[in-house]
From Swiss-Prot:
Summary of subunit composition and partner proteins: Component of the pre-66S ribosomal particle. Interacts with NOP7 and RRP1. Interacts with RSA4 (via WD repeats).
Subcellular location: Nucleus, Nucleolus
Protein family (similarity comment): Belongs to the eukaryotic ribosomal protein eS8 family. Ribosome biogenesis protein NSA2 subfamily.
Region (Disordered): 1-38, 56-84
Alphabetic keyword roster: Nucleus, Ribonucleoprotein, Ribosome biogenesis, rRNA processing
Entry protein name: Ribosome biogenesis protein NSA2
GO biological process, one term: maturation of LSU-rRNA from tricistronic rRNA transcript (SSU-rRNA, 5.8S rRNA, LSU-rRNA)
Gene, per the UniProt record: NSA2
Composition skew (Basic and acidic residues), residue ranges: 7-37
Motif Nuclear localization signal 2, residue numbers: 51-58
């Protein structure tokens, strides 16, 4: 046996630890945490190398998944009549039912229907800078610390919302700028109803603003439409529906929205 294979030799002679499999399983389970920590903490050249390695891993994984999905797709449903005769390229797809093509066309059709279903009244809105969105709050004994921010726009918080302790609250959402209801207009019925807001679905400015519940022009919100008496095709009452804010709530002092139907 070569000299550099002493570990394999020792395993063959004495075997492994009794808890080897358990230790190996736990190490593999911790691998995700280690990768996440490296992604957050690495700096400089090591971070670049790590990002490059992760990018190549993700690309290879995507290729494997795509190849696996393509292998599942069936080929022509009926075999060719004469196997021995070679057909030219322009005759290969004639009189054959390819499931992959049907699947691709159905996916495209569904995407078009989805885009048409959720077309919004305001497709584009003005961008808002962080200086306009947040106000710096000075804290500390001598007012030298400036890690706190106060949102200057109207926000929505849920029913069970509780503020964090003052010394740990980084972003302040003032109680005076919180909204619970919106003036929602139904485009087909032509009526405007004062409906309670259920949540913020999407803020076009940033995902962080969506998480904070900031209400700006163009934001998609979910409202309670049970008062309108809308019913589905199956006869069930519609509870929540999406609406888009069409005004500037911080200027008008109220939220006006159009229901997406």
């Amino acid at each position: 046996m070569p000299q550099n294979e002493y570990i394999e030799q020792h395993i063959k002679q004495h075997g492994r630890r009794l808890d080897h499999e358990e230790r190996k399983r736990k190490k593999e389970a911790r691998e995700g945490h280690r990768v996440a920590k490296d992604a957050q903490t690495l700096k400089g050249w090591r971070a670049k190398q790590f990002a490059k390695k992760r990018y190549s891993e993700k690309v290879s994984m995507r290729k494997k998944i795509k190849a696996h999905q393509e292998s599942k797709v069936k080929g022509p449903s009926t075999p060719k009549q004469d196997e021995g005769e070679a057909l030219p390229t322009y005759l290969l797809d004639r009189q054959t039912n390819n499931t992959a093509k049907a699947l691709s066309s159905s996916i495209k059709q569904k995407r078009l229907e989805k885009a048409d279903k959720f077309s919004v009244p305001l497709p584009k809105v003005r961008g808002i800078s962080e200086e306009e969105m947040f106000k710096v709050i000075k804290t500390g004994k001598s007012k030298t610390k400036s890690w706190k921010r106060m949102i200057t726009k109207h926000t929505f918080v849920g029913e069970g919302f509780t503020r964090r302790p003052v010394k740990m609250e980084r972003i302040i959402r003032p109680a005076a700028l919180r909204q619970k209801k919106a003036n929602v207009t139904h485009p087909e019925l032509g009526v405007t109803v004062f409906l309670p807001i259920l949540g913020v679905k999407k803020n076009p400015q940033s995902p962080m603003y969506t998480q904070l519940g900031v209400l700006t022009k163009g934001t998609i919100i979910e409202v309670n439409v049970s008062e309108l008496g809308l019913v589905t095709a199956g006869g069930k009452v519609v509870w929540g529906k999406y609406a888009q804010i069409t005004n500037e709530p911080d200027r008008d002092g109220c939220v006006n929205a159009v229901l997406l139907v």
